[in-house]
Amino acid sequence: MELHRVGNAVPLDRQAGLTTAQWHEDLTFFATQLTSLHPDAFANTPKAKFDAAVAELDGKLDHLNPDEIYVGLDRIANLIGDGHTYVDFPPDSANLPLDIMRFGADSRIDMVAPGYERALGTRIVAIQDTPLASARELAATATPVAETTGLRDRRIDAHLTIGMMLHGLGVTPSRDSARYLLADDDGKQFTMDFKALAPGERTKWIHAASPLPLAEQPLDGSAACTYLRPANTLYCNVRTILQLEKPSQQMLELIHLEHPAKVVIDLRQNGGGDYNLGLQYLVRPLAEDKSINRKGHLFILIGPDSFSAAMSNAAQFRTMTRATLVGEPIGERPNTYQEPREFTIPNSRLVVRYSTRFYRFATGPENIIAPDKQVVPSWTDYKAGRDDALEWILEQK
Protein backbone atom coordinates (compact mmCIF):
# COMPACT_ATOMS: atom_id res chain seq x y z
CA MET A 1 0.00 0.00 0.00
CA GLU A 2 1.28 3.45 -0.85
CA LEU A 3 0.67 5.85 2.01
CA HIS A 4 -1.75 8.61 1.13
CA ARG A 5 0.29 11.40 2.66
CA VAL A 6 2.88 13.42 0.77
CA GLY A 7 4.09 16.92 1.35
CA ASN A 8 6.47 19.67 0.32
CA ALA A 9 8.28 20.14 3.61
CA VAL A 10 11.95 21.06 3.68
CA PRO A 11 14.69 18.45 4.28
CA LEU A 12 15.24 17.17 7.80
CA ASP A 13 18.56 19.00 8.21
CA ARG A 14 16.66 22.29 7.90
CA GLN A 15 14.20 21.21 10.58
CA ALA A 16 17.04 19.91 12.76
CA GLY A 17 18.65 23.35 12.57
CA LEU A 18 15.65 25.20 13.97
CA THR A 19 15.99 26.92 17.31
CA THR A 20 13.64 26.11 20.15
CA ALA A 21 12.17 29.59 19.76
CA GLN A 22 11.34 28.82 16.12
CA TRP A 23 9.63 25.56 17.10
CA HIS A 24 7.56 27.42 19.70
CA GLU A 25 6.59 29.94 17.00
CA ASP A 26 5.63 27.09 14.68
CA LEU A 27 3.47 25.39 17.30
CA THR A 28 1.59 28.60 18.05
CA PHE A 29 1.05 29.28 14.35
CA PHE A 30 -0.02 25.67 13.71
CA ALA A 31 -2.60 25.55 16.51
CA THR A 32 -4.03 28.97 15.69
CA GLN A 33 -4.30 28.35 11.95
CA LEU A 34 -5.71 24.86 12.24
CA THR A 35 -8.49 25.78 14.64
CA SER A 36 -9.42 28.91 12.69
CA LEU A 37 -9.41 27.30 9.23
CA HIS A 38 -11.20 24.04 10.03
CA PRO A 39 -14.98 24.71 10.08
CA ASP A 40 -15.63 22.68 13.25
CA ALA A 41 -12.31 22.05 14.96
CA PHE A 42 -13.78 20.98 18.30
CA ALA A 43 -16.57 18.69 17.10
CA ASN A 44 -14.76 15.57 18.32
CA THR A 45 -12.32 16.92 20.91
CA PRO A 46 -13.36 19.61 23.42
CA LYS A 47 -11.43 22.86 23.13
CA ALA A 48 -10.05 22.46 26.64
CA LYS A 49 -8.58 19.06 25.78
CA PHE A 50 -7.17 20.37 22.50
CA ASP A 51 -5.58 23.37 24.21
CA ALA A 52 -4.13 21.10 26.90
CA ALA A 53 -2.49 18.94 24.23
CA VAL A 54 -0.94 22.02 22.64
CA ALA A 55 0.31 23.26 26.01
CA GLU A 56 1.77 19.85 26.84
CA LEU A 57 3.73 19.75 23.57
CA ASP A 58 4.85 23.35 24.08
CA GLY A 59 6.27 22.39 27.48
CA LYS A 60 8.30 19.55 25.98
CA LEU A 61 9.60 21.19 22.80
CA ASP A 62 13.01 22.10 24.22
CA HIS A 63 13.79 18.42 24.80
CA LEU A 64 12.41 16.82 21.62
CA ASN A 65 14.06 15.98 18.31
CA PRO A 66 12.39 17.01 15.01
CA ASP A 67 10.75 13.60 14.50
CA GLU A 68 9.23 13.71 17.98
CA ILE A 69 7.96 17.23 17.31
CA TYR A 70 6.42 16.11 14.01
CA VAL A 71 4.59 13.29 15.81
CA GLY A 72 3.42 15.72 18.48
CA LEU A 73 1.99 18.07 15.86
CA ASP A 74 0.33 15.22 13.99
CA ARG A 75 -1.25 13.89 17.17
CA ILE A 76 -2.80 17.31 17.78
CA ALA A 77 -4.07 17.54 14.19
CA ASN A 78 -5.67 14.12 14.52
CA LEU A 79 -7.67 15.34 17.52
CA ILE A 80 -9.79 17.25 14.98
CA GLY A 81 -10.99 13.78 14.08
CA ASP A 82 -11.62 13.54 10.33
CA GLY A 83 -9.45 11.57 7.93
CA HIS A 84 -8.48 14.57 5.81
CA THR A 85 -6.91 16.58 8.64
CA TYR A 86 -3.28 15.77 9.52
CA VAL A 87 0.32 16.93 9.16
CA ASP A 88 1.86 15.71 5.91
CA PHE A 89 4.86 13.45 5.92
CA PRO A 90 7.72 15.36 4.26
CA PRO A 91 9.59 13.78 1.32
CA ASP A 92 12.43 12.65 3.60
CA SER A 93 10.19 10.67 5.97
CA ALA A 94 12.48 7.61 5.70
CA ASN A 95 10.11 5.04 4.21
CA LEU A 96 11.17 1.51 5.05
CA PRO A 97 11.12 -1.12 2.26
CA LEU A 98 8.18 -3.18 3.48
CA ASP A 99 4.38 -3.10 3.56
CA ILE A 100 2.13 -4.43 6.30
CA MET A 101 -1.36 -5.91 6.10
CA ARG A 102 -3.60 -6.97 8.96
CA PHE A 103 -5.16 -10.45 8.89
CA GLY A 104 -7.23 -11.01 12.01
CA ALA A 105 -4.93 -10.43 14.98
CA ASP A 106 -1.78 -10.79 12.87
CA SER A 107 0.23 -8.06 11.15
CA ARG A 108 1.86 -9.68 8.10
CA ILE A 109 4.52 -8.38 5.74
CA ASP A 110 2.89 -8.58 2.33
CA MET A 111 5.52 -6.73 0.25
CA VAL A 112 9.27 -6.11 0.49
CA ALA A 113 12.03 -4.65 -1.62
CA PRO A 114 14.67 -6.96 -3.14
CA GLY A 115 17.03 -8.33 -0.52
CA TYR A 116 14.37 -8.75 2.15
CA GLU A 117 12.55 -11.76 0.68
CA ARG A 118 12.93 -13.86 3.82
CA ALA A 119 10.51 -11.52 5.59
CA LEU A 120 7.68 -12.08 3.09
CA GLY A 121 4.56 -13.44 4.74
CA THR A 122 5.97 -13.37 8.26
CA ARG A 123 4.14 -12.10 11.32
CA ILE A 124 5.55 -9.07 13.10
CA VAL A 125 6.21 -9.81 16.77
CA ALA A 126 8.05 -6.64 17.80
CA ILE A 127 9.83 -3.58 16.43
CA GLN A 128 13.17 -2.97 18.15
CA ASP A 129 12.35 -3.70 21.81
CA THR A 130 8.69 -2.71 21.57
CA PRO A 131 6.09 -5.52 21.33
CA LEU A 132 3.83 -5.13 18.32
CA ALA A 133 0.72 -4.45 20.41
CA SER A 134 2.49 -1.58 22.18
CA ALA A 135 3.84 -0.19 18.90
CA ARG A 136 0.33 -0.22 17.46
CA GLU A 137 -1.02 1.61 20.49
CA LEU A 138 1.62 4.30 20.05
CA ALA A 139 0.92 4.63 16.33
CA ALA A 140 -2.82 4.87 17.01
CA THR A 141 -2.23 8.20 18.75
CA ALA A 142 -1.46 9.66 15.31
CA THR A 143 -4.71 8.55 13.68
CA PRO A 144 -8.01 10.50 13.41
CA VAL A 145 -9.97 10.09 16.62
CA ALA A 146 -13.43 10.13 15.00
CA GLU A 147 -12.84 7.72 12.12
CA THR A 148 -13.58 3.99 12.05
CA THR A 149 -11.36 1.28 13.45
CA GLY A 150 -10.76 0.07 9.90
CA LEU A 151 -9.29 3.37 8.73
CA ARG A 152 -7.24 3.79 11.89
CA ASP A 153 -5.86 0.25 11.58
CA ARG A 154 -4.76 0.88 8.00
CA ARG A 155 -2.98 4.07 9.03
CA ILE A 156 -1.32 2.26 11.90
CA ASP A 157 -0.06 -0.36 9.42
CA ALA A 158 1.43 2.42 7.31
CA HIS A 159 2.93 4.28 10.29
CA LEU A 160 4.85 1.14 11.30
CA THR A 161 6.77 1.22 8.00
CA ILE A 162 7.95 4.84 8.21
CA GLY A 163 11.25 5.59 9.90
CA MET A 164 10.28 9.15 10.80
CA MET A 165 7.14 7.97 12.59
CA LEU A 166 8.82 5.08 14.42
CA HIS A 167 11.62 7.36 15.61
CA GLY A 168 9.19 10.10 16.60
CA LEU A 169 7.13 7.60 18.60
CA GLY A 170 10.23 6.44 20.44
CA VAL A 171 10.11 2.92 19.01
CA THR A 172 13.47 3.14 17.20
CA PRO A 173 16.69 4.96 18.15
CA SER A 174 16.95 6.56 14.70
CA ARG A 175 14.82 7.12 11.62
CA ASP A 176 17.27 5.42 9.24
CA SER A 177 16.51 1.78 10.05
CA ALA A 178 14.32 -0.47 12.14
CA ARG A 179 14.82 -3.98 13.45
CA TYR A 180 11.75 -6.20 13.25
CA LEU A 181 11.29 -9.42 15.20
CA LEU A 182 9.43 -11.74 12.84
CA ALA A 183 7.84 -15.19 13.01
CA ASP A 184 7.26 -17.53 10.09
CA ASP A 185 4.30 -19.89 9.74
CA ASP A 186 6.20 -22.59 11.64
CA GLY A 187 6.63 -20.24 14.59
CA LYS A 188 10.37 -19.77 14.08
CA GLN A 189 11.44 -16.27 15.08
CA PHE A 190 14.24 -14.17 13.63
CA THR A 191 15.18 -10.51 13.33
CA MET A 192 15.68 -8.44 10.20
CA ASP A 193 16.94 -4.88 9.85
CA PHE A 194 15.18 -2.72 7.26
CA LYS A 195 17.08 0.33 6.03
CA ALA A 196 15.14 3.40 4.90
CA LEU A 197 14.83 4.22 1.22
CA ALA A 198 16.31 7.48 0.01
CA PRO A 199 13.83 10.34 -0.55
CA GLY A 200 12.05 9.71 -3.85
CA GLU A 201 13.65 6.29 -4.30
CA ARG A 202 11.44 3.75 -6.03
CA THR A 203 11.74 0.02 -5.60
CA LYS A 204 10.44 -3.05 -7.40
CA TRP A 205 8.12 -4.59 -4.85
CA ILE A 206 8.08 -8.33 -4.29
CA HIS A 207 4.70 -9.67 -3.18
CA ALA A 208 3.82 -12.44 -0.75
CA ALA A 209 0.75 -13.30 -2.83
CA SER A 210 1.46 -15.72 -5.64
CA PRO A 211 0.03 -15.45 -8.20
CA LEU A 212 -0.71 -11.76 -7.80
CA PRO A 213 -4.51 -11.25 -7.70
CA LEU A 214 -6.07 -9.30 -10.55
CA ALA A 215 -6.98 -6.50 -8.13
CA GLU A 216 -3.32 -5.89 -7.23
CA GLN A 217 -1.77 -6.09 -10.67
CA PRO A 218 -0.18 -2.84 -11.95
CA LEU A 219 -2.39 -0.40 -13.84
CA ASP A 220 -1.40 2.03 -16.56
CA GLY A 221 -3.56 4.98 -15.61
CA SER A 222 -6.36 5.65 -13.18
CA ALA A 223 -8.50 2.62 -14.07
CA ALA A 224 -8.68 -0.41 -16.33
CA CYS A 225 -11.36 -2.91 -17.31
CA THR A 226 -10.88 -6.62 -18.00
CA TYR A 227 -13.51 -8.89 -19.49
CA LEU A 228 -13.51 -12.22 -17.65
CA ARG A 229 -14.97 -14.39 -20.38
CA PRO A 230 -15.53 -17.66 -18.44
CA ALA A 231 -17.64 -15.77 -15.90
CA ASN A 232 -19.16 -13.37 -18.46
CA THR A 233 -18.16 -10.55 -16.12
CA LEU A 234 -16.61 -7.15 -16.76
CA TYR A 235 -14.18 -6.26 -13.97
CA CYS A 236 -13.04 -2.62 -13.67
CA ASN A 237 -10.31 -1.70 -11.22
CA VAL A 238 -10.58 2.01 -10.38
CA ARG A 239 -7.55 3.24 -8.41
CA THR A 240 -8.29 6.97 -8.38
CA ILE A 241 -11.31 9.15 -9.10
CA LEU A 242 -9.41 11.27 -11.62
CA GLN A 243 -8.96 11.11 -15.41
CA LEU A 244 -11.89 8.74 -15.83
CA GLU A 245 -13.21 9.83 -19.23
CA LYS A 246 -11.24 7.27 -21.27
CA PRO A 247 -11.65 4.38 -18.78
CA SER A 248 -15.39 5.09 -18.69
CA GLN A 249 -15.53 5.01 -22.48
CA GLN A 250 -13.66 1.70 -22.47
CA MET A 251 -16.07 0.30 -19.88
CA LEU A 252 -19.16 1.29 -21.87
CA GLU A 253 -17.69 -0.05 -25.12
CA LEU A 254 -16.95 -3.41 -23.50
CA ILE A 255 -20.48 -3.57 -22.09
CA HIS A 256 -21.86 -2.91 -25.58
CA LEU A 257 -19.49 -5.42 -27.21
CA GLU A 258 -19.53 -8.31 -24.72
CA HIS A 259 -22.96 -7.96 -23.07
CA PRO A 260 -21.62 -9.10 -19.67
CA ALA A 261 -23.99 -10.59 -17.14
CA LYS A 262 -22.18 -8.71 -14.36
CA VAL A 263 -20.13 -5.55 -13.98
CA VAL A 264 -17.74 -5.18 -11.05
CA ILE A 265 -16.30 -1.81 -10.00
CA ASP A 266 -13.37 -2.28 -7.61
CA LEU A 267 -12.80 0.68 -5.27
CA ARG A 268 -10.81 -1.19 -2.61
CA GLN A 269 -7.48 0.51 -3.40
CA ASN A 270 -8.92 3.88 -4.30
CA GLY A 271 -7.69 6.84 -2.26
CA GLY A 272 -10.09 9.34 -3.82
CA GLY A 273 -9.96 12.27 -6.22
CA ASP A 274 -13.04 14.20 -7.38
CA TYR A 275 -16.32 12.49 -6.56
CA ASN A 276 -18.07 14.53 -9.25
CA LEU A 277 -15.97 12.71 -11.86
CA GLY A 278 -16.94 9.37 -10.37
CA LEU A 279 -20.56 10.42 -10.47
CA GLN A 280 -20.26 11.55 -14.10
CA TYR A 281 -18.22 8.69 -15.52
CA LEU A 282 -19.12 5.70 -13.34
CA VAL A 283 -22.27 6.04 -11.26
CA ARG A 284 -24.63 7.74 -13.71
CA PRO A 285 -23.67 5.75 -16.85
CA LEU A 286 -24.18 2.46 -15.01
CA ALA A 287 -27.39 3.72 -13.39
CA GLU A 288 -28.75 4.48 -16.86
CA ASP A 289 -27.83 1.07 -18.31
CA LYS A 290 -30.95 -1.04 -17.75
CA SER A 291 -29.15 -4.26 -18.65
CA ILE A 292 -26.62 -3.75 -15.83
CA ASN A 293 -28.49 -1.71 -13.24
CA ARG A 294 -30.33 -4.69 -11.83
CA LYS A 295 -29.97 -6.61 -8.61
CA GLY A 296 -27.32 -9.30 -9.01
CA HIS A 297 -25.73 -7.68 -12.06
CA LEU A 298 -23.82 -4.67 -10.66
CA PHE A 299 -21.30 -5.10 -7.85
CA ILE A 300 -19.06 -2.60 -6.05
CA LEU A 301 -16.00 -3.88 -4.18
CA ILE A 302 -15.19 -1.77 -1.11
CA GLY A 303 -12.82 -1.86 1.86
CA PRO A 304 -11.07 0.21 4.52
CA ASP A 305 -8.83 1.89 1.90
CA SER A 306 -11.80 3.20 -0.13
CA PHE A 307 -11.26 6.81 0.84
CA SER A 308 -12.63 10.28 0.16
CA ALA A 309 -14.19 10.43 -3.34
CA ALA A 310 -14.16 6.61 -3.51
CA MET A 311 -16.23 6.49 -0.33
CA SER A 312 -18.59 9.13 -1.73
CA ASN A 313 -19.08 7.27 -5.01
CA ALA A 314 -19.64 3.97 -3.19
CA ALA A 315 -22.41 5.66 -1.20
CA GLN A 316 -23.89 7.02 -4.44
CA PHE A 317 -23.82 3.58 -6.05
CA ARG A 318 -25.86 2.36 -3.08
CA THR A 319 -28.50 5.10 -3.32
CA MET A 320 -28.62 5.69 -7.09
CA THR A 321 -28.32 2.14 -8.44
CA ARG A 322 -29.26 -1.42 -7.52
CA ALA A 323 -25.62 -2.32 -6.94
CA THR A 324 -24.52 -4.85 -4.34
CA LEU A 325 -21.61 -3.67 -2.19
CA VAL A 326 -19.14 -6.47 -1.41
CA GLY A 327 -16.04 -6.62 0.77
CA GLU A 328 -15.28 -4.88 4.07
CA PRO A 329 -16.66 -1.70 5.67
CA ILE A 330 -15.23 1.52 4.28
CA GLY A 331 -12.76 3.15 6.66
CA GLU A 332 -13.87 6.75 6.28
CA ARG A 333 -17.20 7.75 7.76
CA PRO A 334 -19.72 8.90 5.11
CA ASN A 335 -20.98 11.88 7.11
CA THR A 336 -17.84 13.85 7.78
CA TYR A 337 -15.65 16.77 6.79
CA GLN A 338 -13.77 16.59 3.47
CA GLU A 339 -12.56 18.99 0.74
CA PRO A 340 -9.03 19.37 2.14
CA ARG A 341 -6.89 22.47 1.81
CA GLU A 342 -3.43 23.07 3.24
CA PHE A 343 -1.15 25.60 4.86
CA THR A 344 2.59 25.62 5.53
CA ILE A 345 4.13 26.16 8.95
CA PRO A 346 6.64 29.04 8.54
CA ASN A 347 9.92 27.79 10.03
CA SER A 348 9.79 24.00 9.66
CA ARG A 349 7.88 24.27 6.37
CA LEU A 350 5.77 21.28 7.40
CA VAL A 351 2.52 21.10 5.44
CA VAL A 352 -0.79 20.75 7.29
CA ARG A 353 -3.96 19.53 5.60
CA TYR A 354 -7.39 20.39 6.94
CA SER A 355 -10.98 19.77 5.87
CA THR A 356 -13.23 22.62 4.79
CA ARG A 357 -16.70 21.22 4.10
CA PHE A 358 -19.12 18.78 5.70
CA TYR A 359 -20.69 16.11 3.50
CA ARG A 360 -23.51 13.70 4.26
CA PHE A 361 -23.54 10.56 2.13
CA ALA A 362 -25.54 8.20 4.33
CA THR A 363 -28.67 8.16 6.43
CA GLY A 364 -29.54 6.08 9.45
CA PRO A 365 -28.09 5.73 12.93
CA GLU A 366 -24.74 4.21 11.93
CA ASN A 367 -22.24 6.57 10.34
CA ILE A 368 -20.56 3.89 8.25
CA ILE A 369 -20.78 2.31 4.81
CA ALA A 370 -20.91 -1.43 5.36
CA PRO A 371 -21.06 -3.97 2.53
CA ASP A 372 -24.23 -5.84 1.66
CA LYS A 373 -22.05 -8.96 1.61
CA GLN A 374 -19.06 -8.90 3.94
CA VAL A 375 -16.07 -10.91 2.77
CA VAL A 376 -12.96 -10.65 4.93
CA PRO A 377 -9.75 -11.91 3.28
CA SER A 378 -7.86 -14.68 5.05
CA TRP A 379 -4.09 -14.94 5.07
CA THR A 380 -4.17 -18.45 3.58
CA ASP A 381 -6.25 -17.38 0.59
CA TYR A 382 -4.39 -14.09 0.11
CA LYS A 383 -1.01 -15.85 0.07
CA ALA A 384 -2.33 -18.27 -2.55
CA GLY A 385 -3.35 -15.37 -4.79
CA ARG A 386 -7.08 -15.73 -4.21
CA ASP A 387 -9.43 -12.76 -4.05
CA ASP A 388 -12.26 -14.02 -1.85
CA ALA A 389 -14.56 -11.05 -2.45
CA LEU A 390 -14.25 -11.12 -6.24
CA GLU A 391 -14.61 -14.91 -6.27
CA TRP A 392 -17.87 -14.61 -4.30
CA ILE A 393 -19.21 -12.26 -6.97
CA LEU A 394 -18.16 -14.54 -9.81
CA GLU A 395 -19.93 -17.47 -8.15
CA GLN A 396 -23.29 -15.68 -7.98
CA LYS A 397 -25.88 -16.92 -10.46
Regions found by a protein language model. Name each.
Residues 1-13, 17-31, 185-188, 200, ...:
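C-terminal "post-core" interaction segments
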Residues 1-263, 271:
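Flexible, low-complexity junctional segments that flank or bridge functional domains
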